[in-house]
Regions:
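Bacterial N-terminal signal peptides that target proteins for export
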Residues: 1-12
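C-terminal motif of bacterial Sec signal peptides marking the signal peptidase cleavage site
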Residues: 18-21
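A residue-level marker of the well-folded mature domains of exported/periplasmic proteins
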Residues: 4, 23-384
Length: 384
């Protein structure tokens, strides 16, 4: 901005001193004429020339990095539990990514989900064995945070995927989709499935402390505050710990305890499959519907017969691939894990860059909706 300078002209009045001669009978003294005061030289006021200074941009555009990896060493994958079709599909993507970016992946996790502390020994073992990176889906965000922090202190790159821990305990969190969007989708599926968006609904979740499921359920509850969902009544939230037998038992209990139940919403692929099997076996198709997050191959038959009118999920293989690529980028030093960094992972996201956002999070993309119109094609195209 240019400064405006005001000019002031300096005016100086010159006063002439006149000597008067006085007549007197006494001798008149001789008075030397007064010397006129000199006229001061006033320097002209000069308006300075102000050169505008270009404003620096708020932030310099960071270079977009294409991750190449080329790493060696061990990368340990720690899902919530083993034998889970969802994480098995993710591990397919991880193995595929290892051929592109280097490193040797392996899985180590509890046999059963639901225990907040069960992952800690696996994190500690990977740290002791000097793994280059660990990929963790948190069963409990708080319980494992100290073990993750200790791993970072030993130089292990910590990548969370699917379910997050506490900020500061990891390098990057690879989130499968926007949390608010998933919650909104669950609420909308319940509304679409319940008769005229009215009636009793219940939630069958994974573990009570599961970070991602709890966040989605909270987002669903927030969405349902809208008057559009006023006719829906949430009567229960139960937990199957992502174990088929536990989830089946919980679905049976829900139906027995709530004879007017219209929809079971399950934000877990294990739970949604178990609930669909229970509804089908009890011949309640058309009376109790099941919606939630499910894999296309497992849910195809239940979508086609009307047990589960629609479910949604992201490409779990791509989720695993992206998580491993991020780990490789951190190990190689191609990315640092700072907010604002942009990078490209070849073969996914259409070549568009991912940007690290708040809490060091990146998002895989939008979920896929599976229904009668598209389930056959998705089940054919997607190997999970």
């Amino acid at each position: 901005m240019f400064n405006r300078l005001s000019r002031f002209a300096a005016g100086i009045a010159l006063v002439a001193v006149v000597a008067s001669a006085c007549s007197s009978t006494a001798a008149t003294p001789t008075v030397a004429p007064a010397t006129p005061a000199p006229t001061p030289v006033v320097a002209p006021v000069v308006t300075p020339v102000v050169t505008p200074v270009a404003s620096a941009p708020a932030s310099a555009a960071a270079a977009v990095v294409t991750i190449k990896g080329g790493i060696t060493g061990s990368v340990v994958v720690i899902p919530k539990n083993l034998g889970n079709a969802y994480f098995d599909a993710g591990y397919v993507g991880i193995q595929k990514a290892a051929t592109a970016f280097g490193g040797t992946p392996s899985q180590a996790a509890p046999a059963k989900g639901g225990d907040p502390t069960a992952q800690i020994p696996f994190i500690q073992t990977a740290t002791t064995q000097k793994a280059k990176a660990i990929l963790v889906s948190a069963e409990d965000a708080t319980a494992i945070a100290p073990a993750l922090t200790a791993a970072k202190a030993q130089g292990v790159k910590v990548v969370m995927w699917d379910s997050n821990s506490k900020p500061g305990a990891y390098d990057i969190f690879v989130n499968q989709a926007d949390t608010a969007g998933i919650g909104k989708g669950l609420a909308q599926m319940a509304c679409d499935t319940a008769p005229s968006c009215t009636g009793e609904i219940a939630i069958l979740s994974a573990g009570q402390t599961a970070t991602n499921q709890n966040a989605w359920i909270a987002a669903m509850a927030e969405t349902m505050k809208d008057t559009k969902f006023a006719g829906l009544k949430l009567v229960a939230t139960v937990y199957g710990n992502d174990v088929a037998a536990d989830s089946t038992a919980q679905a049976q209990s829900l139906i027995a305890a709530h004879p007017n139940l219209k929809v079971i919403v399950s934000p877990t692929s294990v739970g949604v499959l178990a609930a669909a099997q229970v509804v089908q076996s009890k011949k309640l198709i058309g009376k109790v519907a099941v919606v939630g997050l499910g894999t296309p191959k497992a849910m195809q038959a239940y979508i086609l017969d009307g047990t589960a009118p629609e479910v949604e999920l992201w490409n779990t293989i791509d989720l695993g691939y992206l998580a491993y690529a991020v780990a490789a980028g951190l190990v190689s030093g191609e990315i640092k894990g700072t907010v604002g960094e942009q990078f490209i992972v070849p073969t996914i996201n259409g070549g568009k860059p991912y940007t690290i956002g708040a809490d060091n999070t990146i998002i895989l993309g939008d979920p896929l909706i599976f229904n009668k119109d598209n389930i056959a094609q998705f089940a054919k195209d997607l190997p999970f």
